[in-house]
């Protein structure tokens, strides 16, 4: 096998696309850029997210993810939850284990008719019952 028999691997060498070199080439006149307009001009680059005048996707979708800077209080109805009544001591961690509320919650308010009766069991200052401030 000599050097004269060497060939590049199939598909590794592509033919150069010469544009704007006459109509006979099939890529003359507009040089594969289509008609007139902004996209036919040199230096044109669309902004990220630009959809040709259509309302962009990021403006069509609703805004999400806002969290207020005010304190986050989680309310628990005692009448609907028997497990709270059975606790000996009501602490923030014991309520979190029962309810799995998010980490950004700073306090818990126990509401319902029986909430005031549980005030003696509360051992955490982050927990209030209805009627307390």
Swiss-Prot record:
Region (Disordered): 1-64
Keywords tagged on the record: Ribonucleoprotein, Ribosomal protein, RNA-binding, rRNA-binding
A single GO BP: translation
Gene Ontology molecular-function annotations: rRNA binding; structural constituent of ribosome
GO cellular component, one term: cytosolic large ribosomal subunit
Keyword Ribonucleoprotein included in the entry's annotation: yes
InterPro entries membership: Ribosomal_uL15, Ribosomal_uL15/eL18_sf, Ribosomal_uL15_bac-type
Membrane-spanning residues: none
Function: Binds to the 23S rRNA.
Known partners and oligomeric status: Part of the 50S ribosomal subunit.
Family assignment from sequence similarity: Belongs to the universal ribosomal protein uL15 family.
Protein name as annotated: Large ribosomal subunit protein uL15
């Amino acid at each position: 096998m000599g050097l004269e028999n060497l060939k590049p691997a199939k598909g590794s060498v592509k033919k150069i696309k010469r544009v704007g070199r006459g109509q006979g080439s099939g890529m003359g006149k507009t040089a594969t850029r289509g008609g007139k307009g902004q996209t036919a001009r040199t230096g044109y680059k669309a902004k990220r997210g630009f959809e040709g005048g259509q309302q962009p996707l990021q403006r069509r979708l609703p805004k999400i993810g806002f969290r207020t800077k005010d304190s986050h209080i989680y309310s628990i109805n005692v009448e609907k939850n028997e497990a709270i009544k059975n606790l000996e001591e009501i602490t923030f961690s014991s309520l979190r284990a029962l309810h799995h509320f998010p980490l950004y919650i700073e306090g818990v308010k126990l509401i319902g008719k029986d909430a005031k009766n549980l005030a003696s069991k509360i051992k955490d200052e982050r927990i209030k019952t209805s009627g307390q401030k």
